[in-house]
Amino acid sequence: MITAYIDFKSLDCFLALRPILKLAADCETLVSWQPYRSKQRALPTEVASESVTQTHHRVRAESERRLQQHYAELRELDIDPSRGQMDTSAALGWLAGLEGDTSSFVSRLFAAHWIEHTDINDPTFLEELTANCGLTRVHSTVNLDSIEREAEERGLFDAPTFLIEGQMFMGRAHIPLMRQLLTAGGDR
């Protein structure tokens, strides 16, 4: 099993979705989707007298955004970067309250947020999507702080993060290594 910690407002999570679903299908394993509110870093602005640390943070943030945009363009996705600034806590809490294979729900929710620009925190929308995916909501109240605290105790600090056989993989760059682990007789 792949445990995937995601945040719907994270473009990196959205870009990791299709490769993770393909990995799971190829390796005949399930994905357990778990909520984790990522900390969106604001793009620092250049100042006249910035320190080396400030320069590093600014250049790194700019590089991350260019790389995300590059991969979005390769998939012919027209991405509005402002979608990454929206709070998706209600949708994450809803996900945590569902029972069953939530992969279709997660896929549709990411598309609704990033492509269709839908308010994914809207309870009516979430109820309809849950029904359309054949899922059941078993918990109407979820403590995201508690879920995140437990994840952080395991070493998690951002999304997307994936757990396979107790090993943690931060970011989508590790998907080839995850494939190697799963195909070498690992967890199925």
Regions found by a protein language model. Name each.
Residues 12-112:
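Structural alpha/beta surface segment adjacent to cysteine/selenocysteine redox centers
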Residues 3, 7-34, 100, 104, ...:
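C-terminal cap of thioredoxin/glutaredoxin-like
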